Amino acid sequence: MGVLDHVSEMFDCSHGHKIKKRKQLQTVEIKVKMDCEGCERKVRRSVEGMKGVSSVTLEPKAHKVTVVGYVDPNKVVARMSHRTGKKVELWPYVPYDVVAHPYAAGVYDKKAPSGYVRRVDDPGVSQLARASSTEVRYTTAFSDENPAACVVM
């Protein structure tokens, strides 16, 4: 079959055509400020007409929109921003339980909804929040629970 494969490669006409990738089913979470029912309606209608959108869920108190479907997140954000004229961004928060140190300087956000903290992809921020091994040794050396602790007092 080596000869047939070689001949079929020579006369293959599909090299000029791109094969379309099928989009994956995604859940896109978006932050957009919604003050009234009119804003909610405008946000919902801006996304519902998109090709590939299965469902749209609004949480106006948290300023959160969840879009489920076969869509590109960047296209959803661009369309919503263009159609509504509002500032739109991907959901920048993660649940409080996921973060190791939720009150670190780069993570804690006063404007975040309750139960959420800001998502930080920078590994340097998490390193600043954790204590080094020498700091841990110093704090445990003077602990009341440590029987071998310093008893100067």
Curated annotation (Swiss-Prot):
Disruption phenotype: No visible phenotype. Inhibition of HB29-dependent induction of stress-related target genes. Keywords: Cadmium, Cell membrane, Lipoprotein, Membrane, Metal-binding, Methylation, Nucleus, Prenylation. Changing C39G: In HIPP26-4; loss of interaction with HB29. The gene is HIPP26. PROSITE patterns: HMA_2 (PS50846). It comes from the Eukaryota. Residues 151-153 form a propeptide. GO terms for molecular function: cadmium ion binding; copper ion binding; lead ion binding. Gene3D superfamilies: 3.30.70.100. Residues 25-89 form the HMA domain. It is found in: Nucleus membrane; Cell membrane. This is Heavy metal-associated isoprenylated plant protein 26. The modification Cysteine methyl ester is found at C150. A metal cation binds at C36, C39. One of its GO terms (cellular component) is plasma membrane. Induction: Up-regulated by cadmium and zinc, but not by lead or copper. Up-regulated by cold, drought and salt stress. Not induced by abscisic acid or by leaf senescence.
